[in-house]
């Protein structure tokens, strides 16, 4: 049941915690809600236990455990995701189930960067998480300040290795647990009253300042994946679908992109929603778009309508992929180069051939891998586009386009 209406007064930003197991991601997530709630009555506190038993979600046919919390600062409203397990992070980031405008990388000062620290930074780079802020946690467990400097240098180096600006990324040192314990003792602790709580404020300030407010979907170039096509006698051909981004109105020029050998231009002669005429369709709307001079045969499900020049059709790309385990309903066996499944982009399946990278003989269920795909038909592709890999209608993997080759 919804608790009151969501009033949009502040810009909205999606963030999440990433980092190695047991470095304190969930404790930090809980601390953020408590600290923000002390200064803002709209924020609901969430304790460690509530966040840790993250509910299951499904995204692109894959089950993922993700916890969502919300909090706000004086400047912005945040949605924050936290995942209990490492595999959940991989699945979450690859499916884009929880898109992040920026990530909070949690690193334990006692351990320094660990294998999953590296893996999550790499994933963030591949799936296009644009900004990272670092919270160096558990600093109360380290007596030597030089050791803290060393850990900070290591983290900055690691970020640089994966093309994040490691030298300018904010690194905040604190203890999520000590901050949370203080908030449990006194839930009204304000900024300036406790050194550990102040570290959480320092992190919130860094998120406010360093992670820019994203461009809203409605301000991006128009794109609508075509779901269905039909003819209105005497008026022409209508393509229906949900507008992914941008807006569209009568008189706009659009391109029909993908599946066909040629991209063709046409003009929008009508926009309708639930059989009513619409002045303008915007991102998120389910609409029918009437297209001038286009026959029923010239547009089909799986193509996209887009602002001219904003997206192009391609057949060959590189992708970062998560292959489902047998227990997740995936394949029971591995696959090799030459594997030919269906790639489900937006609204349609297209067959493609997989080429594994040099040195990788075989990919097993449960693996996270980067490989090249060549599709048998062109599809409107761009970096960051998510897809499912299917065999006979069941999902066996999920991926994201990391590089377009041709």
From Swiss-Prot:
Domain of life: Bacteria
Family: Belongs to the TRAFAC class translation factor GTPase superfamily. Classic translation factor GTPase family. EF-Tu/EF-1A subfamily.
Binding partners and assembly: Monomer.
GO molecular function: GTP binding; GTPase activity; translation elongation factor activity
Record's protein name: Elongation factor Tu
PANTHER family on file: ELONGATION FACTOR TU, MITOCHONDRIAL, ELONGATION FACTOR TU-RELATED
PROSITE patterns: G_TR_1 (PS00301), G_TR_2 (PS51722)
Keyword Glycoprotein: no
EC number: 3.6.5.3
Residues the entry annotates as binding Mg(2+): 26
HAMAP family per record: EF_Tu_B
Catalytic reaction(s) noted: GTP + H2O = GDP + phosphate + H(+)
